[in-house]
Amino acid sequence: MAFRAVLDAANRVSAERGPTNAALGRNASGAAARDDRFRSFRRASDDALDAVRRIGPFGTSLAALEERLAAARREVDRLLDRPRAEREPEAVERAIEAMFSAYDAAQPLLDTAMTALLADDPQLVGHAMVARMLGEMRDYAGRLGSHLVIAIAQMQPPRPAQQAAFEQTRGRVLQLWPLIGQQASSSREPAIVEAGRAVERDFIQGGMALIDATLARLRNGDFDLTPESFTRDIVPHFVAIERLRDAFVDSTIRQLDAGRQGAQRALVLASLATLLALAVELLLLLAGRQL
């Protein structure tokens, strides 16, 4: 399913920021800075993009995403090849923002995949929209963490521009969740309802509390933490968002399959009706010959 493959690829590109942030804050340089998790997340992004390529022709949209991701990785790699003391805070900030840009380049792909899905069954628009909104929410959640990583790396409270970007991102998360949460809590599917509760518990309450507490520490001049330690603590809180997104995608696929089966049943019934009409005509023809 193209929609799921593109959502997965966009999520992998977004999730790659976690180990990237940790690596940028690590004292090691060169190959030592690129631990197994860092390498595995890059491979996962590449594999997900390859899966999209195999599904169908996405043309320039896929190429643009891959080029943007490659450019962002080059910025990251240039910094990782230097000792940590030589990684200028502004350069770290630019590298993280370049990774933001890589995710943004996935939007045309998502538009194309969603349009194709709805062409198959327009009634799936509700579930498809929620799944996409959850992808956006997962990315915004990760950006909140990345904004704090920038301040941690610079060992100073967020500057006004950084604070504004943080608050804007936080606002988007808080705007999305009531819309998504209402859809999850009112679902007839127990898996979606339970996954929604997990997001409320693990991220809205737990993850946001950790983010707000970390921001307060930075504002108070407490820099006794590292990008790696903060990333290690915050990333598990994002898992619930991904699971809820997957639950909606699974439901969308089931509805699509059910719709196709319904269409196949309708086709069979139509064929039987045609055969019955032909049989009646044949019987009438034979009866007419006998008269």
What are the functions of these language-model segments?
Residues 1-291:
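Hydrophobic alpha-helical segments
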